[in-house]
Regions:
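Mid-protein regulatory/catalytic core that forms ligand/cofactor-binding pockets
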Residues: 138-209, 217, 221, 227, ...
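N-terminal positioning helix adjacent to the helix-turn-helix/winged-helix DNA-binding module
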Residues: 31-35, 92, 119, 152, ...
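N-terminal leader segment of winged-helix/HTH proteins
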Residues: 1-30, 78, 86, 118-175
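Alpha-helical linker/hinge and terminal dimerization helices associated
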Residues: 19-23, 59, 96, 100-115, ...
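Residues in the recognition helix of alpha-helical DNA-binding motifs
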Residues: 69, 126, 218
Length: 299
């Protein structure tokens, strides 16, 4: 993969991962994004009482995954299964969905409200391309034709889930690494024709938005697998720098090439347009600020 492609893949992976992290931080620990998406779908007038199979089609999810979510949410009294097999929200479920929707709407608003009109239009076009991709189940849904100036919880979650799944699947097909572990290696890949890129632990914490403990354990694991080496920092006696090995370079090159192909299949040549990259860079900055502000939001 060339340096320009590596930069594009790094940018997209960061945007997707940080949106996913924001969603995960705002949902209760015992609730998955899939479970919340089901609750949110059942709040809509056209689908407030539907069969699980219908809900799966509306959400573009596997029926087995929806059935599992139904069981969990029913046990928590957030939805009920009616005598005819349809599912609907309980009063507690409707209240929980409303509170969580308010939280997620606030997060996504922080991410997009300071974008320029041009940047909003660029991102709206990207989402329309992805949702209306030929052969995609999303193409039959209203999301494909909606203008996305109002990037709310429902649309934000649908986009985040779709993009995260596509990227994560491509990574897992090529390697046994998690998406976060792959991003660890991806950040170490040089984005210009310069010397090898080396980063400190604190740099990785900032780039990946993870804890220091993850960076420590992941670096040991990735070193044992032969993807990176830890070298002493000449400017800091106690510091350690991370650097890709030749095996790590090859891994990043192969997986990044696959990820780039996935992005092109969804967005076409737009992935290479400078205006798109500028919009994504600004979005990434706003995501970082939104993640920092989560603790200060008035719940």
């Amino acid at each position: 993969v060339d340096y320009a492609k590596a930069h594009i893949v790094t940018l997209w992976c960061a945007v997707i991962a940080k949106a996913t992290r924001g969603v995960t931080k705002l949902l209760p620990k015992q609730m998955t994004p899939l479970q919340f998406r089901l609750l949110a779908q059942l709040t809509l007038p056209e689908s407030e009482r539907v069969l699980p199979m219908r809900a799966a089609r509306l959400l573009v999810l596997k029926p087995a995954d929806v059935d599992e979510a139904v069981g969990v949410l029913a046990d928590r009294d957030l939805l009920r299964v009616c005598d005819d097999g349809c599912i609907e929200l309980t009063r507690a479920g409707r209240e929980r969905a409303a509170r969580l929707t308010e939280r997620l709407n606030a997060f996504f608003a922080l991410c997009v409200d300071d974008l320029s009109e041009e940047e909003r239009a660029v991102l709206a076009d990207l989402l329309r391309r992805a949702f209306s991709m030929p052969g995609s189940c999303y193409a039959r849904r209203p999301l494909a034709g909606e203008a996305s100036e109002a990037f709310d919880a429902r649309r934000g979650l649908a986009a985040t889930a779709m993009l995260h799944y596509a990227v994560q699947t491509a990574v897992k097909k090529a390697t046994s690494l998690s998406l976060t572990d792959f991003r660890f290696l991806l950040e170490l890949y040089p984005k210009r024709r310069t010397a090898a890129r080396m980063l400190r632990a604190r740099d990785m914490v900032a780039f990946l938005r993870t804890g220091r403990a993850y960076v420590t354990t992941a670096s040991v694991r990735l070193e044992e697998q032969g993807y990176l080496v830890r070298v002493p920092d000449e400017r800091d006696a106690r510091g350690i720098l991370f650097k890709l090995t030749p095996q790590g370079m090859i891994c990043v090159q192969e997986v990044a090439e696959d990820l780039y192909a996935v992005l092109v299949s969804m967005f076409g040549e737009a992935v290479e347009e400078r205006v798109v990259q500028r919009a994504l860079k600004h979005l990434l900055e706003l995501e970082d600020a939104a993640l920092d502000a989560l603790a200060e939001l008035p719940w």
